[in-house]
From Swiss-Prot:
Binding site for substrate: K71, N116, R117, M118, G119, F120, N186, N191, N257, T258
Gene3D superfamilies: Aldolase class I
Organism: Pseudarthrobacter chlorophenolicus (strain ATCC 700700 / DSM 12829 / CIP 107037 / JCM 12360 / KCTC 9906 / NCIMB 13794 / A6)
Protein name: Dihydroorotate dehydrogenase (quinone)
Pathway: Pyrimidine metabolism; UMP biosynthesis via de novo pathway; orotate from (S)-dihydroorotate (quinone route): step 1/1
Membrane topology reported for the UniProt record: Peripheral membrane protein
Length: 356
C-alpha cells in the first residue's frame, strides 16, 4: 500500500500549491541534513544496469528531475538521494529576480497537471554558482564511481530587452558553466514576455553560438550544450530547430517545456480559467511531447542526445520515450503527486523490465 497519495490528499491538496512545494522541498532537504540521506541512498540507488551514457557522461539512471523543482541549487544532494540520475537546476538568470506575483502555481488534480507562471524566480547566477560547485564536489566524494549528474538551465532576465538577450545569457553561461555537467538554454518558457521569440532560428543561432563559446571558455573544457523547446512549435519550426542544432553541433535538445494549450482537460473549464495564464505541465502534455520527440528523432537520427520531458508519470512512460529515441528522460509534475520515492520506484521497474 502506498502512503503518499493519502498524505497528499490530507496534507497538501487543500494548501496553496507553492507553499506545499516549499514545505515538501524543505522536508527533502531536512532528511539529507539529519543523516537520513545515507539510508535513502541505499534504498533508492539505481541498479547498475540502468547506467546510461550521454554526451560523454555516464548517468546512474536515464531518469532525472527536470528544471523547475530546485531553481537555485539548494537541494541537489538531497534530491539525488531519492534516486534521480540527474538533477537539472534552474531556470537561473543573469540577475536575481523575484518572478511573477503570487499566486502563480496551480494544481489541476483531476488532470494530474499543474499550471505555473512562476517567471524564473531565482537569486541569480552569481549566488547559485557556489552551491553548484559545492554540490558537485560533494557528489564526487559520495559517489566516486558514477555520480548523479548536475544540469544547469539558464534563461533571460525579465528586465533585459530581447535585443540584449545574448549578453544576458552569456553572463549566466560564464558564471555557471564551470560547475555544470551540462548547460541548457531555455527559450521556451511562456512566462517571460517575448522569450519564445528567441526560438526563431535566426535569433537562436547567434544566441546558442555565443553561449557555447562562453561556457567552454569559462569552464576550460567543453560543456555539453542543449536547447529546450516548447511543445507549441509547429512541426516545421521543430524541423528548423533540429537542423540548426545539427548545424551548430549542439549536444542535444530537450523536448518539451510546458504548453500554453488548454485542450482536452478533465478539470472544469471555470477552474482552468481561474488559474489564468501560464504553462501547463503534467499528464495532458504526454501525447504532444512524445510527438515532438519522435519528430526530432526522425530529423536528427543519432547525431544528438534527446532528453524527453512532459507528461512522464510511470516507468512505462520512461520506456516509451527511450523506445522513441530519447537517451534520457525527465519528470517533475508527477513528483508532486507521487511523492519522494517516485524516482526510486521508476528505477526499480525499469531494472526489472531489463532483467525479464
Amino acid at each position: 500500500m502506498r502512503v503518499y497519495p493519502t498524505f497528499f490528499k490530507l496534507a497538501f491538496s487543500w494548501m496553496d500549491a507553492e507553499r506545499a512545494h516549499t514545505l515538501g522541498f524543505k522536508g527533502i532537504r531536512l532528511a539529507h541534513a539529519t543523516g537520513a540521506g545515507r539510508v535513502l541512498r541505499k534504498l533508492t540507488a539505481p541498479a547498475p544496469s540502468l547506467q546510461t551514457t550521454a554526451f560523454g557522461i555516464t548517468f546512474p539512471s536515464p531518469f532525472g528531475l527536470a528544471a523547475g523543482f530546485d531553481k537555485e541549487g539548494h537541494g541537489i544532494e538531497a534530491l539525488t538521494e531519492l534516486g534521480f540520475g540527474h538533477v537539472e537546476v534552474g531556470t537561473i538568470t543573469g540577475q536575481a529576480q523575484p518572478g511573477n506575483e503570487q499566486p502563480r502555481l496551480f494544481r489541476l488534480i483531476e488532470d494530474r497537471a499543474v499550471i505555473n507562471r512562476m517567471g524564473f524566480n531565482n537569486d541569480g547566477a552569481a549566488a547559485v554558482a557556489p552551491r553548484l560547485k559545492s554540490a558537485r564536489a560533494a557528489l564526487q566524494r559520495t559517489y566516486p564511481a558514477v555520480r548523479p549528474v548536475i544540469g544547469v538551465n539558464i534563461g533571460k532576465t525579465k528586465v533585459v530587452e530581447l535585443a540584449d538577450a545574448v549578453d544576458d545569457y552569456r553572463i549566466s553561461a560564464r558564471t555557471l558553466a564551470p560547475a555544470a555537467d551540462y548547460l541548457v538554454v531555455n527559450v521556451s518558457s511562456p512566462n517571460t514576455p517575448g522569450l519564445r521569440l528567441l526560438q526563431d532560428v535566426e535569433t537562436l543561432r547567434p544566441l546558442l553560438t555565443a553561449v557555447g563559446e562562453e561556457a567552454d571558455r569559462a569552464a576550460g573544457r567543453h560543456v555539453p550544450l542543449l536547447v529546450k523547446i516548447a511543445p507549441d512549435l509547429s512541426d516545421e519550426d521543430i524541423d528548423d530547430v533540429a537542423r540548426l542544432a545539427l548545424d551548430l553541433k549542439l549536444d542535444g535538445i530537450i523536448a518539451t517545456n510546458t504548453t500554453i494549450a488548454r485542450t482536452g482537460l478533465a478539470s472544469p473549464a471555470e477552474k482552468v480559467e481561474q488559474c489564468g495564464a501560464g504553462g501547463l505541465s503534467g499528464a495532458p502534455l504526454k501525447k504532444r511531447s512524445l510527438e515532438v520527440l519522435r519528430r526530432l528523432k526522425q530529423a536528427t537520427g543519432d547525431a544528438l542526445t534527446l532528453i524527453a520531458v512532459g507528461g512522464v508519470e510511470t516507468a512505462q512512460d520512461v520506456q516509451d520515450r527511450l523506445d522513441a529515441g530519447a537517451t534520457l528522460v525527465q519528470g517533475y509534475t508527477a513528483f508532486l503527486y507521487e511523492g519522494p520515492f517516485w524516482a526510486a520506484r521508476i528505477n526499480r521497474q525499469l531494472a526489472r523490465s531489463r532483467r525479464s
